[in-house]
Each structure stands twice: as C-alpha cells, then as structure tokens.
Amino acid sequence: MSIRAPPRLLELARQRLLRDQALAISTMEELPRELFPTLFMEAFSRRRCETLKTMVQAWPFTRLPLGSLMKSPHLESLKSVLEGVDVLLTQEVRPRQSKLQVLDLRNVDENFCDIFSGATASFPEALSQKQTADNCPGTGRQQPFMVFIDLCLKNRTLDECLTHLLEWGKQRKGLLHVCCKELQVFGMPIHSIIEVLNMVELDCIQEVEVCCPWELSTLVKFAPYLGQMRNLRKLVLFNIRASACIPPDNKGQFIARFTSQFLKLDYFQNLSMHSVSFLEGHLDQLLRCLQASLEMVVMTDCLLSESDLKHLSWCPSIRQLKELDLRGVTLTHFSPEPLTGLLEQVVATLQTLDLEDCGIMDSQLSAILPVLSRCSQLSTFSFCGNLISMAALENLLRHTVGLSKLSLELYPAPLESYDTQGALCWGRFAELGAELMNTLRDLRQPKIIVFCTVPCPRCGIRASYDLEPSHCLC
C-alpha cells in the first residue's frame, strides 16, 4: 500500500489563505514570492476580488501575465486587477516587495505558474524590460506603467472586458500606456472597428491582419487609421475586392486614398495579400508610396497584370527581399521578362520563392533558369502545379546544383505523367519520379524534395513522390 506524501508547508499555507480572504489580505506583504503565482491563479479562478486587488499591489515580479488566465474572461475579476493597478499608480511609496511594471493581457500559450517556476523564474523581469524598452515606440524615453494587449475583433460587438479595459486605459492616459502590437479583424462591422481604433495608441501597432471579405469602399474607411500606425511592419489582407458598380474614376480615387497611407509608414517591411483583386493594373500606385525596403512580398491568388509584375521588378524597395510568394497568380500568358527582372533584383537576398500554381510553361521556365541558379541564399523553392515537361524539369534540377542552402524543394509532376484527358497515370508518374530523383542524386544530395501532381478533382489532395510514391485520398 502506497503512503501519500504530506502536503508541503507552502501548499498548506496556500490552502489556508484561499479559505480565509481576510487573512490573505492582511498578510500579503509578508508572503514569500513563491506563493504568489499559484495563489493568484486560484484567486482569479475563484473570483476572490479583494484578494486579487491586494495581490496586484504587492506583486513581487515586474510582469503579471494575466492573458494566460483570460481564456474565459470575467469582468469583475479584471476590474479587481485594474483597481489594484489604480492604487499603485496613485501611491507615492509602493509596498516593500511590489515590483509590478507590466500587465500583460495578451493571449499566449503559456501556463501561468510555469512562467515563474524553475529556470524561468527571472523570465518575467527580462521579458518586461525588453518589451517596454525595445518594442513599444509610443512611450518615449520615460517608461510608464505598461499594459500589453492584442486586439482580435471577431464578433459584431466588442466584449465587455475589452471595452472596460480600453475605456479604463483612455481615462488614465499619462499615468500608464496601453500597448497593442497586433490587430486582427475577422468580422466586426467597420463602424465598431473605428470605435475601437479611436481608443488605441495607433503608434504601437506593428502588425495588422484583415481576414474578412471587404469591399474596397470599406478598406478606404479603414485606411486613415492605417496611416496613423507609423510603426507598422506587416499588413495582411484577405478577400478585398472592388465592386463592379464603382465607376472607374471613383475606383482610382479609392485606390489612391489607400495607397497614399504607405507614405507615412517608414518601417513597413512585409506586404501580404490573398485573393485581392482591386490592385490589378494599379500596383504601381502602392509601390511608389513605399518608404522602406521590403523583406516579404506575398500576393497569393491575386489578380495581377503583366504591367504590375514589371512595376514590381522596377521597385527600389524590393532589393532586400527575403521572401517572394506569387502562389496562384496566373502567369501563363505573361512574357518571362518581368519575372526574370524581378528575380534579378533579389538574387543576393532571396530565401523563399513560391511560384506554385502559376501556370508557368517550359519556355518561361527556361528564361528564368539562369537568374534562378544565382539565388545563392535560396532555402525554400515551391514550383509545383506548373505545366512542365520531363526535359524541362531535368534542366531545372541541373540549374539548382549551386544552390547549397536549398532545404525544401517542391516540384510539379512532369506533363508526361498525365494522359491526353489530363488524368494522372499513376504508374508513369512513379516511374518518372524515380528517374528525376536519381538525376538529382547524381548532381547533389537533396534534403527534402517532393514531386507533386495537380490536386485530385475528387478529393483536392495532390499525389506526391519523394522517396516513394504517395497517393491522394481517393
């Protein structure tokens, strides 16, 4: 029969303090710091509001990572924490062990108690110093009390906890700084989004992601706020289109009002657009407004004209580009010169190139091979889904011999793998895949390489060949 170990003294003390809220409050300044994380977590989950308020005032770490406890937010518990912060802000002399400088409400995948345990015990201090000093440009030289949040707007209305927090922060401007680095929009009406943005320090926002289908006219209402995010590094847009009802003159004005905001973004580095159609024939307007060198250009399933690609290749801001993703942009009828010129501009820096499902033909591939073979930093190359013959694929593999940093390569199944109706001939694909793999091994030793078919018309999955063939789901 096993004998159960008796509870540690710290555990017994914690249990007693949770049962007796008055005792917990009266002895707070004498508690060992080891008790604070577990006691706070229990008090928060049990909604012991007075205990929470007192614990915040005596918190012995510089950072309180409340976001990890806010999976199911409770307004009264949040109010108690903020009331504790209010007391700290008005105190001339803090309690002896109080060190709190950062209230972190971001939704992170951290266990609250693990943050303070073992080797990571000093982590909250180190992290808070880095965040306040390096990552929040809106605070100036003197660092006030910091409140970190991420905004994820996915409901039609703002939840009561976030509403209370933003209003609380706005009323205490000058005493503390509410910093939001990431803004995600999934479905909130534009008038509600604007209401939120009017309560946020826009200077702090570094990443914006709009994941809902907007008309161009809606994007234009959002644009002035984008221009005020002067430290914006990354913008991600999904499913933005211009209604066919918009007259051409109005469309041009709308595009100008959007693109002109980039003139104010001195630190902008990452442009990511997915299923965006309104810039077709107008990409040059955006490119002319860029103020800094881009590190990433992602334009997947977008409508682009050949002139758009030319203007991209001429843009001075792409010369330090590390990632270029044109997946799903139809290039079948384009001259190869714009893509060749584009690769020429980034040959010294490009690390990731995705030309998947671009409809590239043998002649276009042949034209870009000389410059592709000089992309010495290339580590990831995705080219599957293009209409390439066996001979052209073998030529492509020969041109990758000097690309020593390649670690992931995705290539299309040769055209000869399909019958005249476009159906995959499985045996032929496996045979040609083995030949291509042998050809490559004669040239160099690949790390990860896969030859992929077009998606199956029934299940949507690509069959593949790496070390051996792999079927789709059918």
Swiss-Prot record:
One annotated GO biological process: negative regulation of apoptotic process
Top-level taxon of the source organism: Eukaryota
Q: Which GO terms describe its molecular function?
A: ubiquitin-like ligase-substrate adaptor activity
According to its record, what are the GO cellular component terms?
A: Cul2-RING ubiquitin ligase complex; cytoplasm
Q: Which residues cross the membrane?
A: none
Give the Gene3D superfamilies listed for this entry: Ribonuclease Inhibitor
Task: Answer yes or no on keyword Aminoacyl-tRNA synthetase.
Answer: no
Write the record's keywords in alphabetical order, separated by commas: Leucine-rich repeat, Repeat
Whether Repeat counts among this entry's keywords is: yes
The segments carrying the LRR repeats are: 97-122, 177-201, 202-228, 229-264, 265-290, 291-322, 323-341, 347-374, 375-399
Database matches in SUPFAM superfamilies = RNI-like (SSF52047)
Recorded hits in InterPro entries, A to Z, give: LRR_dom_sf, PRAME, PRAME_domain
Family indicated by similarity: Belongs to the PRAME family.
Under PANTHER family, the record lists:
PRAME FAMILY MEMBER 7-RELATED, SIMILAR TO PREFERENTIALLY EXPRESSED ANTIGEN IN MELANOMA-LIKE 3
Q: What is this protein called?
A: PRAME family member 8
Q: To which species is this protein native?
A: Homo sapiens
